Amino acid sequence: SEMCIRDRSSIDVLLVPGRLIDSGLSVEQATAQFGYLAGMAQPLLLMATIPTMSLATSLVPAVSEAFALNKWQIIEQKAATAMKLCCLITVPASVGMWVLAEPISCLLYGTAKAGVAIMHSAPAICLLGLQQVTTGMLQGMGHTNLPMLNMLIGIAAKLVAVLRLTNAEYGIAGAAWATNINFGVTALLNIIALYKFSIRFSWLSIAKIIAAAAVMGAVAVEVHMLLGGASALATIAAMLAAGISYIILLPLLGVLNRQELRQLPVVKRFFK
């Protein structure tokens, strides 16, 4: 797994700057563009997926124990809960980073120039989260080699995507989408493998999470525009308003029931 991560990073370092130069950028411009992706956008992606990495790590022994006892109902329950939690965290993070990419760039880095790289890296939060959690499920079921094989296939897809998409038309956005394709292919292959082992997920719940996140994104944009959109205060206020609207929408759409709300540290005090 560590080897795969190093290979993925090596593809970016070895190919992306060269592809940007081939597309017509100067060495200085290509270096700056790559810096926006690797030095500004990708750290945000990794930071946003820390909770899902922890979730995936805790999932392995839990699923492994149920698998050893041949308790498939418990495995399915844990897998469905983990997938739901993953989407609850990563889908709004992806939407928020997409719609507020430029303001986030200004807030954190003092420049709007990383906005494009941040925006087009946003889907990778959700896709990497899915990859992490599904990998944890498969490893817990004893299929340790399968996630690594799927990761290698994802890296191969990324290699092709970097060569095809990092060009004059797409620029650094193409390199960001190559990473999205990498995580997306790996996550999809993991999900297909889980389906072959009769693990099912509640896609209706996931669709509701996406709907809530979409409304949240609209709230973020509207609040940011109403407050002028140029200040750090406007960005922070937009994030807060978006977060509040998302939390309100989840129970209204039936994504979280009263019992699940009690388990959330932030709101459980209101559901005693």
Question: Could you say what each language-model-derived stretch is?
Answer:
Residues 3-5:
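Short, small-residue-biased leader/transition segments that mark boundaries at the very start
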Residues 221-272:
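Membrane-proximal transmembrane or re-entrant/amphipathic helices at the cytosolic face
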Residues 31, 96-126:
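Interfacial segments at transmembrane-helix termini and the short loops linking adjacent helices
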Residues 145, 155-192, 218, 222-240:
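Membrane-interface helix-loop junctions in multi-pass transport and translocation proteins
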